[in-house]
Amino acid sequence: MKRLLSLIFLVFVFFAVMLTPPALAGDAAAGKTVFTAKCAQCHLGGKNLVNPAKTLSKADLEANGMASLDAIITQVTNGKAAMPAFGKLLTAEQIENVATYVLAQAEADWK
């Protein structure tokens, strides 16, 4: 009986860990400050004034392969298409914070 309870407990812990969303690495509050100063001109409220089909909504990020911290960091750092590179304008920490903020806002549907 003790083994069965131990097994059930371990299975429960395993699934609890596996179903917990990963913590975001950066500081979303600091990212909001940078986003407001550097990104909101084109991406206010998660929109995209240059290419309205590629917003910062969770669905669009997923559809465009951008729903990860690494993908957003890479695009902000290097730029892509009409989006300029910010790698020389922002520190790596600022870029990570912006990416964290964008993912958090996408999860909250930019509310």
Curated annotation (Swiss-Prot):
Binds 1 heme c group covalently per subunit. Keywords: Electron transport, Heme, Iron, Metal-binding, Photosynthesis, Signal, Thylakoid, Transport. Heme c binds at C39, C42, H43, M83. Residues 1-25 form the signal peptide. Pfam families: Cytochrome_CBB3. PROSITE patterns: CYTC. One of its GO terms (molecular function) is heme binding. InterPro entries: Cyt_c-like_dom, Cyt_c-like_dom_sf, Cyt_C6, Cyt_C_IC. It is found in: Cellular thylakoid lumen. GO terms for biological process: photosynthesis. It comes from the Bacteria. One of its GO terms (cellular component) is plasma membrane-derived thylakoid lumen. Monomer. Functions as an electron carrier between membrane-bound cytochrome b6-f and photosystem I in oxygenic photosynthesis. Belongs to the cytochrome c family. PetJ subfamily. This is Cytochrome c6.
